[in-house]
């Protein structure tokens, strides 16, 4: 199996919802055992370029969640689907 690297961006200003989203993404990546770079985007101007409501999550340049805390299972499902299409 070819390992595909994915950059996962978490958009948020450090609020509890954004921090929980980060933890859920981290856990999903660990459970799937995938190669991922997880980046916290906290600059308000950069966040505004990507999402209207935080927290937000993007895989590479694709927004997959916005304005909610995705569960670990939701993240895993989206990641698997995304990586199958790469």
UniProtKB/Swiss-Prot annotation:
Gene3D superfamilies from the xrefs? Glutaredoxin
On the tree of life, the source organism's domain of life is Archaea
Q: Where is the active site?
A: 15, 18
Keyword Amino-acid biosynthesis listed: no
Q: Please give the Gene Ontology molecular function terms for this protein.
A: protein-disulfide reductase activity
* N-terminal signal peptide: none
Which keywords appear in this protein's UniProt record, sorted alphabetically?
A: Disulfide bond, Electron transport, Redox-active center, Transport
Matches recorded under Pfam families: Thioredoxin_3 (PF13192)
Q: Which cysteines are joined by disulfide bonds?
A: 15-18
Q: Does the keyword NADP apply?
A: no
Which SUPFAM superfamilies does the annotation name?
A: Thioredoxin-like
Q: What does this protein do?
A: Does not function as a glutathione-disulfide oxidoreductase in the presence of glutathione and glutathione reductase. Has low thioredoxin activity in vitro.
Q: Which family does it belong to?
A: Belongs to the glutaredoxin family.
Q: What is this protein called?
A: Thioredoxin
In its UniProt entry, the species of origin is given as Methanocaldococcus jannaschii (strain ATCC 43067 / DSM 2661 / JAL-1 / JCM 10045 / NBRC 100440)
